Amino acid sequence: MKCLNIVRSVLAAAFMLVVPSAVLAEAPVKTVNFSILATESSTSLQSFWAPIIADMEKQTGYKIKPFYGSNYTALIEAMRFKQTDLGWFSNQSGLEAVRRSGGEVFVRTFDPSGRDGYRSLIIVPAKSNLTLDQVLKCDKSLNFGIGDAKSTSGTLAPMTYLFAPRGIKPAECFKTVRSANHQANLFAVARGVLDVATNNSTAVNLQKDRDSSVNDAIRIIWTSPPLPEDPIIWRKDLDPQVKARLRKFFETYGQGPGPEAARQRALLSKVSIGGFKPADNSHLLPVREMEATEIYLVAKEDGDAAKIAAAQKVLAGIQAERKALAGRTSK
């Protein structure tokens, strides 16, 4: 009997050693939901992002489920309701994700050329004789294409740097105003469907690499000051282990020498990304300043003293933040 008890104890101990690893092996793989900025058609984005997502799955060990929102607001709301865990955002939509959706910037993109920043553009058909002055006449004779309401280069930048300083409201300036993504606006101008539209240097350069005939059919008549690159944002309440794996993937993907890194960079270049650099919410300070500047200019145009004072206070606070940040980073 004593021997039997010993055998049972040994078997029980062996069972306890084996079962946890078996259960662990059979545990379902965690799914991480990743939203992708709607800069062009979802069909195009899916084909370009699929191999990058496959690499993300391999390196993190998670199942990565992509979410292609039809517009920028869809990405913000998806994160707000915890339908997504992280996403590639524009700066303005990313700012909204931080404000409303519990988001947090952890990396940001950089251009394949290695340079930082891109620019908002105003484009017209190449065959058109339109000048910027003629566009700004606001005689309601032109069909205008603008970006998504939460697009930095498609809406915020042209409003802040071009229209608002002149007291121009697009709805009152043009015959029609159509909101669409950069690719749609680029094609609409190239085909003469639109007389003028916003766009950005990234989308134009990307299209040049894919099919330069489209670029030959458009002409740039205005260029903005440099804009910060796009942020990648995750939910602040994500599991720390998930955050650690995601951070490692983004900060190392496409980096370093060798054929594997070169392959990864080639995949990223198809969506005009050179790689990712560490970042935090201070990355959004320039966009907050742009937003506050537009609000101030609109208040000034309307002549509302209370709104002007409030806008000036907000703008001054943001400028002080930027100055303090510049002081810390220069040390």
Question: What residues fall within each predicted segment?
Answer:
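Bacterial N-terminal signal peptides that target proteins for export
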Residues: 1-11
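Bacterial N-terminal signal peptides
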Residues: 9-20
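Bilobed "Venus flytrap"/periplasmic-binding protein-like clamshell domains
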Residues: 29-57, 69, 92, 118-187, ...
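Periplasmic-binding protein-like
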Residues: 33-38, 111-121, 212-247, 265-280
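An extracytoplasmic/periplasmic, membrane-proximal ligand-sensing/linker region
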Residues: 40-41, 47-51, 245-331
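Short helices/loops that flank or line small-molecule/ion binding pockets
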Residues: 73-87, 100, 118, 182-197
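A ligand-binding cleft/hinge motif common to bilobed small-molecule-binding domains
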Residues: 88-101, 164, 190-191, 195-215
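A structural signal for short loop-to-beta-strand junctions that line the ligand-binding cleft
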Residues: 103-115, 145
